[in-house]
Swiss-Prot record:
Mode of membrane association: Lipid-anchor
Name of this protein: N,N'-diacetylchitobiase
Gene: chb
PTM notes: This protein is probably a lipoprotein, its processing is inhibited by globomycin.
PANTHER family from the UniProt entry: BETA-HEXOSAMINIDASE, BETA-N-ACETYLHEXOSAMINIDASE
Catalytic activity: Hydrolysis of terminal non-reducing N-acetyl-D-hexosamine residues in N-acetyl-beta-D-hexosaminides
Location in the cell: Cell outer membrane
Length: 883
């Protein structure tokens, strides 16, 4: 008994000591998290020009920037060295010039800052400056991520309060002057009140009561208006119940009663359509005083005709329609939106709201990017780890319960870094989409961008091995444990980013996932007809053209210097892949991703799925469309035009692929709206894509865009027709989510510019020239009717400003209101806006706002604050100023 008492006393004493230790460590974490004020100041984006050894540090393209990271301790003194700050940096940190601290990269964008032996503590009120050298440049505020946190052994990690905010401007300074330039030769026009005013000067308010978005193929305007104050009598039997409900939902938004008085006749008569009108989605419609008559090629055409009725309605005064007749058909069969819910999750409600708007503007393909390195977002029955582990990001260094934090998500799961669609959620999305004539295309990205899957299946492997179930543990394992390949992916992950394409277990995994997803589609009554393989960026960036070997005899100044002998191609050190190379199944390691795509296409075809889709670089080593087992093989083409895309897109079409134009420099909606550091987004392909630029994109004549736009540095480029090829299959607008951390940010980035993508996908404009081999375009070619382009955009912009933005607001969409242009001349304020019809306001003190009228320009002095305001007055743009 005495022995037991002594043991018990010893245990209690030990536990008390542990509790005391844990408490002191937690106190340090809490103190630093609550009291450290962290600020970033950009010092230069031209490191090499400022004497920094970018090349010797191994910076890609020998390009680096310098930033001061300043830490101010606003709390009590901290003497402990046993702590670390984890912070997110999309740029690799190459050097920290402070002997008291060291920085290491954990994985992806997650970096670790910790004290060295020379650390002498944080005194109360002390300011510590850490000069950081990072790769490339940092030109926009959203290059800097929130979500830094403090950790210590035996303590719960805690978010640093000063970086627990979406107000990035509160901790970033220095983005001005030359620091706005990517290089000293950057010729972009930076957005300010005056430059916006000059850009908008060719726009004018005009009557657009008979103008419809997207523009129909043929419109004949009548005289007068048709009274619909008492609603329209839409025949309910023309649609199934779910589609009629979808139509009713849109009718409520625009303020039209579909069970009213004005007769509407709808018939589906495909035999009556010939030539360019004989295709799915086509319709003819007549709107007259005695009723509306619709004749459709198919059910999709009937649905779109009704959407055209709603499109002509002014939701702020929904009592009339213009008399007119329409003959209409879509330009492309594929009119898509891609939404990345993997990097950061977006809610089911946000997806449903997107489907509503897609239907209203006649878009018909929702491509869901469901998986990536940073997250797996779809429940798969039988593989619970995919969502238990792969759908969550938190601070677990072993990644047994979650993925490590990325992209500003911090140490906890209570944000959009975590989340997934349950099976029921996904089935609901499918049903909702089907009712709106939209096909949902699921993308499970592989073999690259697959870290969430790989880590999840390793967690599954470990669980089952602990249970003694070795065969079951290996059933769906995705990495070769003997693979020692040293690789760095585009977003700075190691070999865990890749599904090993040489293992039978990988093929079983793909088969399992496709089967489960197909079953969900079947349950929803929307059979799976297209499987998106992903396939992009299966490479080691260190073997790219931006690096040279440390021992190279003829080094160039514009490449980073590294030891290339330590770098591998993906899978090069995998014994299982080496076997495939040795036995001649695959010619070399570079061909493995395309080989894997071909193998997956066989699984897809065996399951009766007719269409196989991928990002084009994933298929680059395949021998054309005939190498795939499915009826159709489609590629999202995403080469940048000024890097050769004006020509290479036609190569893919010539190989027999159905090309879906998806160019990042024109239809990526994660790029900033303006060349302004306040705007959100990545900008590797273009410094900005606003609604006007997207509207002016010529998707079938790629060289033409060289005359109407510039490269990412604001310089001209050339494009020449070189290859004869079949017509393209479609157009897709993409929203990648690295910088998009919540639904509000998501809708801001997508709307309203996605309406310009809808316009280009449905309608070919007169100013779009035919593609011709031998014709070259540039800033000086003068082959494009730019007057016609500008007039066309003016109409489009007026429809947005006068009608469509109000509909977005009534739909609850957090769209972006344009920042006004303004100038002061002779003491008078002049203002304009990208979408005529949007209300403008100004203020002399930043608090009291007055409505601007161009016919009564006000006299002003000093700094004048400006903004635009929505139709309800409840939503305002970003506020800027002019002097």
């Amino acid at each position: 008994m005495l022995k037991h008492s002594l043991i018990a006393a010893s245990v209690i004493t030990t536990l008390a000591g542990c509790s005391s230790l844990q408490s002191s460590e937690q106190q340090v974490v809490n103190s630093l998290a609550d009291n450290l004020d962290i600020q970033y100041e950009v010092l230069t984006n031209h490191g090499a020009n400022e004497g920094l050894a970018c090349q010797d540090m191994g910076a890609e393209w020998a390009s680096c920037n310098k930033v001061n990271m300043t830490l101010v301790n606003q709390g009590e003194a901290v003497d402990s060295k046993d702590w670390a700050i984890y912070f997110h940096s999309i740029r690799l940190i190459l050097d920290v010039d402070n002997e008291q601290f060291k920085i290491s990269r954990v994985t992806g964008d997650l970096h670790k800052l910790e004290p060295t032996d020379k650390f002498d503590g944080f005194a109360a009120g002390e300011e510590v400056v850490l000069p950081l050298v990072g790769e490339y440049w940092q030109l926009f505020e959203t290059d800097f991520m929130p979500g830094a946190f403090v950790s210590a052994p035996n303590a719960e990690p805690k978010m640093i309060a000063s970086l627990n905010t979406e107000d990035v401007a509160s901790f970033v300074t220095g983005l001005e002057g030359n620091n706005l330039k990517r290089t000293p030769d950057d010729n972009n026009v930076f957005a300010n009140a005056v430059s916006r005013f000059e850009k908008n000067e060719d726009l004018a308010t005009q009557d657009v009561s008979t103008t419809l978005l997207p523009t129909p193929m043929h419109v004949e305007a009548g005289k007068g208006k048709v009274d619909i104050a008492d609603g329209i009598a839409l025949p309910k039997d023309a649609f199934d119940a779910t589609q009629f409900a979808a139509i009713q939902d849109r009718a409520e938004v625009v303020g039209v009663d579909v069970r009213g008085d004005l007769p509407v006749s709808i018939t589906v008569v495909p035999a009556d359509f010939t030539g360019e009108l004989a295709k799915s989605g086509a319709y003819e419609m007549s709107i007259k005083g005695d009723g509306i008559v619709i004749k459709a090629f198919d059910q999709a055409g009937a649905f779109y005709a009704v959407q055209s009725i709603f499109g002509l309605v002014d939701s702020q005064n929904a009592d009339s329609l213009p008399q007119l007749s329409i003959k209409d058909a879509p330009r492309f069969d594929y009119r898509g939106v891609m939404v990345d819910v993997a990097r950061n999750f977006h809610s089911k409600d946000a997806i449903l709201a997107t489907l509503d708007q897609m239907a209203a503007y006649k878009m018909n393909k929702l491509h869901l990017h469901l998986t990536d390195d940073e997250g797996w977002r779809l429940e798969i029955p039988g593989l619970p780890e995919l969502t238990e582990v792969g759908a969550n990001r938190c601070f677990d260094t072993q990644e047994k319960s979650c993925l490590l934090p990325q992209l500003g998500s911090g140490p906890t799961t209570d944000n959009f870094g975590s989340g997934y669609f349950s099976k029921a959620d996904y089935v609901e999305i499918l049903k909702y989409a089907k009712a709106r004539n939209i096909e949902v295309i699921p993308e499970i990205d592989m073999p690259a961008h697959a870290r969430a899957a790989v880590v999840s299946m390793e967690a599954r492997y470990d669980r089952l091995m602990e249970e003694g179930k070795e065969a079951e543990a290996n059933e769906y394992r995705l990495m070769d444990p003997q693979d020692t390949s040293n690789v760095t992916t585009v977003q700075f992950y190691n070999k865990q980013s890749f599904i090993n394409p040489c293992m039978e277990s990988s093929t079983r995994f793909v088969d399992k996932v496709i089967s489960e997803v197909a079953a969900m589609h079947q349950e929803a009554g929307a059979p799976l007809t297209t499987w998106h393989f992903g396939g992009d960026e299966a490479k080691n960036i260190k073997l790219g053209a931006g690096f040279q070997d440390v021992n190279a005899e003829d080094k160039v100044s514009w490449k980073g210097t590294i030891d290339l002998s330590k770098q591998d191609k993906p899978f090069a050190q995998s014994p299982q892949c080496q076997t495939l190379i040795t036995d001649g199944t695959v010619s070399d390691f570079a061909h493995l991703p395309s080989h894997f795509a071909e193998e997956v296409s066989k699984i897809v075809a065996e399951k009766g799925i007719p269409n196989f889709q991928a990002w084009q670089d994933g298929l680059k080593y395949s021998d054309g469309e005939k190498a795939f087992a499915t009826e159709n093989t489609r590629v999202n083409f995403w080469d940048v035009l000024y890097w050769g895309g004006t020509s290479s897109v036609y190569e893919w079409s010539k190989k027999g692929y159905d090309v879906i134009v998806s160019n990042p420099d024109y239809v990526y909606m994660d790029m900033p709206y303006e060349v302004d550091p306040k705007e959100r987004g990545y900008y590797w392909a273009t410094r900005a894509t606003d609604t006007r630029k997207m509207f002016g994109f010529a998707p079938e004549n790629m060289p033409q865009n060289a005359e109407t736009s510039v490269d990412r540095d604001g310089n001209g480029f050339t494009g020449k027709g070189e290859i004869e090829a079949k017509p393209f299959y479609g157009l897709s607008a993409q929203l990648w989510s690295e910088t998009v951390r919540n639904d509000e940010q998501y809708e801001y980035m997508v709307f309203p510019r996605v309406l310009a993508a809808a316009q280009r996908a449905w309608h070919r404009a007169d100013w779009e020239n035919d593609y011709k081999v031998g014709v070259e375009y540039s800033q000086n070619s003068n082959l494009v009717d730019k007057a016609s382009l500008n007039q066309d955009y003016n109409r489009f912009a007026n429809v947005l400003g006068q009608r469509e933005l109000a509909k977005l607001e009534k739909s609850g969409i957090d769209y972006r209101l344009p920042v006004p242009g303004a100038k002061v001349e002779d003491g008078k304020l002049a203002m304009n806006v990208q979408f005529p019809g949007v209300t403008l306001q100004y203020s002399l003190d930043g608090e009291n706002w007055l409505t601007y009228a161009d016919n009564a320009r006000p006299n002003v002095t000093g700094e004048v604050f400006i903004r635009s305001v929505s139709a309800t007055g409840e939503k305002v743009s970003r506020i800027t100023s002019v002097k």
